[in-house]
Structure formats: structure tokens, C-alpha cells
UniProtKB/Swiss-Prot annotation:
GO terms for cellular component: cytosol. This is Isoleucine--tRNA ligase. The keyword Metal-binding applies. It holds the Pfam family tRNA-synt_1. Monomer. Catalyzes the attachment of isoleucine to tRNA(Ile). As IleRS can inadvertently accommodate and process structurally similar amino acids such as valine, to avoid such errors it has two additional distinct tRNA(Ile)-dependent editing activities. One activity is designated as 'pretransfer' editing and involves the hydrolysis of activated Val-AMP. The other activity is designated 'posttransfer' editing and involves deacylation of mischarged Val-tRNA(Ile). Zn(2+) binds at residues 904, 907, 924, 927. The gene is ileS. GO terms for molecular function: aminoacyl-tRNA deacylase activity; ATP binding; isoleucine-tRNA ligase activity; tRNA binding; zinc ion binding. A motif ('KMSKS' region) lies at residues 603-607. One of its GO terms (biological process) is isoleucyl-tRNA aminoacylation. Keywords: Aminoacyl-tRNA synthetase, ATP-binding, Cytoplasm, Ligase, Metal-binding, Nucleotide-binding, Protein biosynthesis, Zinc.
Amino acid sequence: MTVDYKNTLNLPETSFPMRGDLAKREPDMLKNWYEKNLYQKIRKASKGKKSFILHDGPPYANGNIHIGHAVNKILKDIIIKSKTALGFDSPYIPGWDCHGLPIELKVEGLVGKPNEKISAAEFRQKCREYASEQVEGQKKDFIRLGVLGDWDNPYLTMNFDTEANIIRTLGKVIENGHLYKGSKPVHWCLDCGSSLAEAEVEYEDKVSPSIYVRFPVESADEIEAKFSAQGRGQGKLSAIIWTTTPWTMPSNRAIAVNADLEYNLVQLGDERVILAAELVESVAKAVGVEQVKILGSVKGADLELSRFHHPFYDFTVPVILGDHVTTDGGTGLVHTAPDHGLDDFIVGKQYDLPMAGLVSNDGKFISMTEFFAGKGVFEANPLVIEKLQEVGNLLKVEKIKHSYPHCWRHKTPIIFRATPQWFIGMETQGLRQQALGEIKQVRWIPDWGQARIEKMVENRPDWCISRQRTWGVPMTLFVHKETEELHPRTLDLLEEVAKRVERAGIQAWWDLDEKELLGADAETYRKVPDTLDVWFDSGSTYSSVVANRLEFNGQNIDMYLEGSDQHRGWFMSSLMLSTATDSKAPYKQVLTHGFTVDGQGRKMSKSIGNIVTPQEVMDKFGGDILRLWVASTDYTGEMTVSDEILKRAADSYRRIRNTARFLLANLNGFDPKRDLVKPEEMISLDRWAVACALDAQHEIKDAYDNYQFHTVVQRLMRFCSVEMGSFYLDIIKDRQYTTKASSLARRSCQTALWHIAEALVRWMAPILSFTADEIWQHLPQTESARAEFVFTEEFYQGLFGLGENEKLDDAYWQQLIKVRSEVNRVLEISRNNKEIGGGLEAEVTLYANDEYRALLEQLGNELRFVLITSKVDVKSLSEKPADLADSELEGITVSVTRSNAEKCPRCWHYSDKIGVNPEHPMLCPRCVENVVGNGEVRHFA
């Protein structure tokens, strides 16, 4: 009669599913988190702890989220959750940037331009409604990523209180003396009809005309005398400039040279020209002239204030000196149009050059522009060239492909154009130097971020903060109708307006009658019609949001975290404003991540068809796989994503999930309140496993603390796959399944598994949030009621290391791992040779040197459980048969033979003592002891 001993085994059992089925299961978990107020429970559990504030850089409220958004929000969420686990109070208030041109353009497409089909007030309301819809759409996707935060109370730059606080920030800028009004060239988008911030400019290749232009000399005698070239050479005499923007020629008001450069008077074919000495050869080659003769040389300084005729207008222009003139290209003489270039403007101010003012807001020449009235600037390029040819002042024309500024929204070329604007001065009150000093106080991650933003601050122009738009926070200023000076009560008036905006939003400004606030002064002062640059909106959130939200409790911001493009964007605008208002950087740490690219390193592009959307990833793989990919990728460089890479992340996920499932299945029936074994009473191997977890936890906590999330994933994988999966968990199966259910041998093992599970679930939670929550719900209850969610908990405190007097210390088990690896290698050879089936069918002899023998013999009969074979003999290396192949592990050689004993149907070990007990004729003595006796005793493994 065959007896079924299956019911005498402690087989693993758990309701924790093998398959994650994440795409299907995660939405229900999110619903549970929301219904049970998870975020508020985290806040309550963290109350009173040291704060860590990560301030959310607001994404723009327009369009669906893309993979870059997902990377950004997931990284932030990992930090917030890990800081909570590290013992911090770390609130997360998500935000959105809600004003600005992209929303205006969308709404224009829906309802028309303001003051045409719809009033400006109605238009603003439509913009507000559109932005609200976009926020809700993006919010759903961010929540779906598993990102925890105060989603019911996000900050929006269009919230009335935030709009009011942005105005108050402007007040502080004015109070500290950083604001001025000036006419200055700014980036101007013809399609936007507005100035652009530095961060809104992209550089793309553009084909432009490249022209060499003659400026005929006013007095040839004077120039000949300067060059000591009287009577030398022949033909007309000109200064030669080179430009790729012919349309700026009508605005030319000077020729700039470098005071320290050498300039030659050159016989170029049948004419005489002035060129920088270093560029004579290259210009001659460019214009196709072989006959060149130097007639004289002077320093640039000697040419100052010499006059030349404008190429096609009836006036002369001076030669001026400028340090911006180099010999990197061109002729060494620079066409200077103060309206259309920052260097031109700066040097022009030194010489009181007039501003031409020929180009209007729509990019067309005004009616008084001779030859080109009403023409668009780019339309005028061929017309200018034609005019230059007509008057004989075009030396050479060709096409050139070069990098040219474009509008980031319209992807169209922009121009520099002088307009009356409001600026934050970089030199006023020493703002530039102060900001550079503050940069050095900040921790930049990666550290190259510091040099990058330093260079940008060193070179950036004054910040033009005014815009000529409808949907934006107004510059709530009153200026004198004649002098343009600010009202003497500006700061008080700003606060009065801010209070009204707090109640009714920005429309309160547009509805305001000047007389309400100014009284009689309304006759001489007018409202400024401009709005603030949206970078002022987001750049002021350190004050408008963080300083005013109760959750932040007046604490300083610890971290800003955004893509690397934000060095010139949000990081820059925030730094400028915070330094201007509070004389300090707004952040202590700045972390930047790279952009996402496809498997071939290409940018995401509709035309290539390589766009990976977070929505598709979550529908196919689930949010946790997306989160694992983000965490396992080194974010300091480009972040590569593809279907193949995500599949690899899914494979890693399965290994982690399988480890967790093994732990839970083998904790079946374990009650920590009743069954927990004291560390000193545990089996040696179990103590080592817990100590192993403690080592891993130290490294994981350190990696989280230093934002090295790919290191966290690597350590997590090593722990699950190597230390646990291929060693400890493999070894303990026999003890778990075959010993008595309540024996010390089994409860010791379960105690270790319980400690490990409690630690593992917390390590995972910041990254694999959904899966960690699922594991948490399946863990055995503790003596004090288990918290409802893992996210309110700190890292596990119950792990312990090996004692100082531990005989079988970590070094011991590391040696055992090497031996086991070598035994497995030889067993695999025997399996492949069909000499054995599984390892339990083998009898192993280890020929070991004295060191290894002493090591192995400490385990006695339990060595076979570590090696997972039915029998192990340890002999001296000197007894090794001559024909036995050497091992790959020095000091030990392994011999494997097939066991001739019988297989025990209960434990599957082979034994020559099966049937010794007549009542259980099929069982080995060990199983008999475990079934009807007191149970086998284990000490080591």
C-alpha cells in the first residue's frame, strides 16, 4: 500500500499571485489609496519629524504627458517616498504652470483673438478654463504613475492667491532696486508678436544669405593718411563688413572694430578695402580675388570715429570700438545695428548711437523706411541684396547654413528687436556676482551642473520680464504718462492690487479704474499694459507657493529636480528672483536628469515614429515596470527606453516578485507574536541571512540618501537573485518543507524570512510602489497592529548583524558560497553527461586542503543541506585520485558519483537506510523522525 506523505510536508502557500498583472491590478490599488486618504496618513505619520522639501517644478498645463514628464515625476516620487522611509517629513505639492503663450494660441484657435471675436476678459476666462482641463488630464496620468502627493490641492500659477503672490514678488524686486525700463534688443518672435525669454529660444540650422558689403569712405585722404598710404593703390576705397542678416542693413548706424587688432588697407583687385590683417587672405578667397597687396596697417583704435557712407542711405556712419569684434570670421569690421543685436546695442550706448526703430511688432518695416516700407524682415533680405547690387556696394553674396535662434513654440526664426521693455538688471545692485556666489553654496547633482549654470549666469543679458500678451500675470505698475517713471507709492499700490487679485484673480487688474487707487494722480499716471514673463511666474514659486503653503511650515527648500534644460530655465529664473528678493539661492540641492532617447540613442520624434508614451507602457507593462526602468537607469546622462529595454525591466521585476512570493508562501502559518525565535537561538545560516539583509539595507539606505537609484536596484537585484535566490532560499527549502511545522529548525527559518520580508518591502516601496503595497497586505500581522500602508513606515529596524563571537561569520559563509558554486559546476557537468539527474541523486566527495577541510567539517552532517546533495564526504586533498580533474577553486577538488541508495519519496534525498522503521517502510530515518518523532535537530543549516 502506497502512503501519501504530502500532508506531512509544510508546502508553501500564499494568496499573493505569481503574476503581477500590473496593468489590470494597479488602478484598483490607486482607488484604494485615494479612498483611504493615503497621502494624508503619510502626512500624519510624519508630523514633527525633520523636514525635507522637494519643490515641484511646474509642468506646462498643455497637452498629454510624455515620457520625460513620467521620468521627472517618478524620480521626485522615489525621493519623497525614500525620504519618508529615512525618517523625514517630506510633503509633495504638485504644481502646474498655467499662463503664457501656448495656452493663448490654443484658445485663439478655439474662440479667436482677444478683442476681435471675444473680449480680453472673456478670453482670459477661456484660457483659465482650458488650463484647468489640461491640469485635470495630466493629473490623472501622473496619479496613474503611482506618484503620491496632495493631488486635491495642487498649486497652479493661475490660483488667485498664487497670482497675488507673484505680484508681491515683483514688489520685492522693485524694492531691492533690480527693475528698470529700457529700450533694448530682445529675442522677438514674429509669430508670437512678443519678446521671448532666453529659455524659450532654441538654435536650429538655417540657410541665410551671406553678404560682403562696401561702406564707401567719406574722406579717402583722411584714411590714406591714417594708413600712411598716400599715393598707394588705386580705385574706390571702402570698409568691408560681412553679415548673414541683410534685412538689418537699413538699421545700420556704425561700423565696429577692435581697438587692439591690426587692420590693413588692401588693394583687392581694382579697389581698395579695409580688412582685419588676419582675415585678408580668407576674405580675398571668399570674394574670388587673387591679386592682393597690403598698402598700409594701423591698429583699430586709429580708425575710431572715421566716417563712411551708409551703403544705400544718404548719411554717414562712424567707426566705433568694441571688444566683441574678433577675427573668428567675417572681415574684422562689424556691421552695427543697435536695434537688432545686444553687442551692437551695448557699444552703441557708449557712442550715443541713435536707435533706428524701423521694425514694428509684426516684423514689418514701418512706413517711413525708405525702399522697404511694409515688407517683412525676411522678405526684405533679397530686396536689400538687390538694392546693394543696384548701388554698387555688394562685394559678394552666397548662401550659408548656420545655427540660428528659433522660437521654441513655433519652430520659426526669430529676430533681435529693440523695444521698450522692463528688465531685471544683472549688474544693478550686483545681482550677477551675488548669484554666482550663491551657486557655490548649492549641491549640484551631477556636479557638472554647477559649471553649466555658472557659465550661463556669467554670460546672460539683463532679464526682460515684460511681455505683450493677454493671458498672464499683469505687471501691476503705474507709470507717469510723460516721464515713464514709476509712481512714488508703487510698493503700496502693488500690495493693494495683490489683495484684489487674491480675491478675484488677475482680471481684477484689468477691471481696475486707475482713479480707485490713484485719485487725482490718475490724470498723470497710466497702467502698464504688459504681462510678466511666465518664467517669472514659475521662478517665483519659492515665495509665491512654498513660503505661503502651511504644509511647508516656512522651511527652506531642499531640492529642485528637473531635466537638464532647466539650468537656463526654471533653475535660472528661480535663482535670479530669489537672489534679487531674498539675497540667497532658493534651493540647497539641484538634481538634473537627462532626456529620454530610443534604443538607438535618437530623440523621440513623430517623424521617426519612435515615441514611447507612458500611457502605452502602463497599459502594456504596468506602472511599476515604468518606475523600475526609471530607477534602474543612470539619470545623469541620456535615458534610453525601448520595448526591449522595458522587457528587460519586466524580467528584473519578475525576479524580485518571485523572491517576495517565496518569502510570503513560506511564512504561511507563521505568527510573529507566537513563533518568533530570538536571534541567539536561531540556526547559524538564518542569522547570517538576516545579517546579509542588514548589510544590504545599509547600502540601499545610503544609495537612496545620495539619489543613486540605479544602485538601489542593482543591490536589490543582487540580494534577491544572488544572496537569497541562488543560495539561502535554495538551501532552506528542505528545512522549510520537511521539518516539523513548529520545530525550531523551521521557525528559525521563518523568523529570518519574516525579518527579510519586512525589510525588503520597505526597500522596494519608493520604486515598486504598487507591488510593495500588495506585499504589505500579505505580510503576517505583528504584535502591534500593522500600519495600513507601507508608505507611512520608516526602513525596518528589526534586522540584526552577526555577533562578534559568531563562529560561522560572514567570511565563513562567503567561503561556503564559493565551495557550493564549484560543487554546482561539477554537478552540472555530471547532469549534462547524463550521469545523474538532480543534485540529490549525487554523492559528493570533497578533497580539500587543511583550511577548507576545517571549514567544511564544522557543518558536520549538515554540509549536505548546504550543497543540496544526499551525501557529502570531506577528505584530504592528498587523497585525491590521480585521474580526477582539478577544480576551478584552488584548494579543493570535487568528485561526483551517482547514489546507489534509494530515494525517499517525502524528502527526495537518497538514503541506504530507507525502511529501517517498519511502520514507514518507504521513509528515510530523518523523515520518520520528522513525521512521528520529536523532529530532527539542526544547528547550522
